[in-house]
Amino acid sequence: MLLIREIMHCKPGKVRPMVDKFLAMSKLNEKAGFGKMRVMTDFCGERYWTIVAEFEVASMQAFEAMMQGEGITPKMTKEFEKVMDGYHDLVEWGRREVYKIEG
């Protein structure tokens, strides 16, 4: 089992719109059978305006299939695209972390 973390450092004043996008994405992920996504904002940390979204996958192959949209309908693909439309305008930079869950 793997833990995937999407870490986004938003532009000032753009955290809430990005949180809304991740919360909508979480609902779509559940609807698609991908599981629940946890969405967190920084209380204090390395940088201000940070959002972390994390979820679990069985394997890298499962993650790759999820990222390629395998198993979802064209209608759901459009919903995912609509939710994430314009997110580049909200983010300065980001990164992905992948951890193996040991226990």
Please report, for each region that a protein language model flagged, where it lies by residue.
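Absolute protein N-terminus
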Residues: 1-2, 103
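Residue-level preference for beta-strand/loop junctions
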Residues: 2, 47-49
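Short hydrophobic/aromatic beta-strand micro-patches
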Residues: 9, 54-56
